[in-house]
Amino acid sequence: MAKGVYILDSEVVIVGGGPFGLMLAIELGRRNVTTLLYDAKNGTAYNPQANATQARTMEYFRRLGIADEIRALGMPANYPTDIAYFTRYGHHELGRFELPASSKANALVRSNQGSWTASEAPHRISQKFVEPVLRRLAEAYDSVTINFGWRMTEFKEGASSVSAVFEQSETDVTHNINATYLIGADGARSMVRKQLGYSLLGEYGEERHFFGGRMYAVYLRCPEFYEVVGKQPAWMNWTFNDNRRALMAAVDGKGEFAFHTQLRSDEDEATITDERAADLFREACGVNIDCEVLSHMGWTAGHSLVADHFISDRVIIGGDAAHLFTPAGGLGYNTAVEDAVNLGWKLAAVLKGQGGRGLIESYEFERQKVALRNTGYARGFADSVGNFVPEDNLEANTENGELLRSAAGEYLVEHAKREFNIPGITFGARYDGSPVLPKTDE
């Protein structure tokens, strides 16, 4: 593309290409709504990020014809999706909540033998594998154009339209966009939300023994992990000790993991090198083990936040721009996908003259309530595991240590059942009182 300024018109412009933005582009593309999507990143997610696709989201993917493709991605079909707890990965196993591998999940769900009865089972897959599928599907619609490597520098909301300016990374190309609606899908630090003056309300970085305050994420490759630590594979691996609490999700079932640990007060994340990141992992293992660090960064756990507003006249926010979770229960990414499904058909109907302003307003009414509900559940899960503190001598090879480990394992497995077996939470959101629902007598 030649250097210069290009003026483009679109019914909808989406700022951000994560799960919410890409899913919304698909929902609009299915309804032939002209849509431009821009994201400052050069492509879809590299780091693992979200690691669980709930059953409702899998049902949406089934409707789009991609459920089987998604289920074939990520970990091998026979890889255990257990939740396992250890003092350290190479030391004592405290307990394990067994869950079916993806090859057995749907058959089990459809047998009506367990707690899940649905057309699709949950699937343990990293967001990094889901996003490319969503991008490809969105780009298949003639009415949708996806642009990665473009940063929004400004936007202005008018009475009947919204304008926005995007600059391409490392070029002199600018797009001046005129759209009927602008969607803020630009994540936790949303420029769109901030310019609208909307506030995130709730708990910021709530401190806990684990899953509260500063955490550190390490994306690593360690194919010999289970051989070295001498344990059976699991999807989610937790350590429970007073020195290096951590969780680690299997990413591909072949040796890539997403490792997260609570930083101690004496640890300065600014000084963490690749080698120190590897040491954090080794401390959680409790044995000497080699690994390749692919990336590492700090993040804050303990958020339970929902924006006070989701919509203005011509600008709408969703996904992480509208709500922030501590990633317990796998609710954040899945809530974002549901935001997109809810908003997509409503935007299309209004743009086609089949609905009025009230239909758009129902998006805020419905999805804000669900966000408050879901962040509350996630906070409860984080409290349950994060405020459960290891007893002294838990790691001791003594009779007392064995008793302490038995009690801890019992508690943690019961916690896992509450956090990772949640059909009621997955399917139980309600839109009572929504303006699009017929009123009934109390």
Question: What is each stretch, according to the model?
Answer:
Residues 4-20:
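Beta1/beta-strand and adjacent pyrophosphate-binding region of the FAD-binding site
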Residues 8-10, 171-181, 185, 312:
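Core beta-strand elements of the Rossmann-like FAD/NAD(P) dinucleotide-binding domain
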Residues 16-25, 134, 184, 293-380:
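Conserved mid-domain beta->alpha element of the FAD-binding
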Residues 29-49:
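Glycine-rich FAD pyrophosphate-binding loop
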Residues 46-137, 240, 375:
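Active-site-adjacent segment of FAD-dependent monooxygenases/related oxidoreductases
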Residues 136, 181, 185-299:
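Conserved FAD-binding catalytic core of PHBH/FMO-like flavoproteins
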Residues 148-163, 298:
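A conserved short coil-to-beta-strand element within the FAD-binding core of flavoproteins
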Residues 156-176:
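Conserved beta-strand-loop-beta-strand element in the redox core of flavoprotein oxidoreductases
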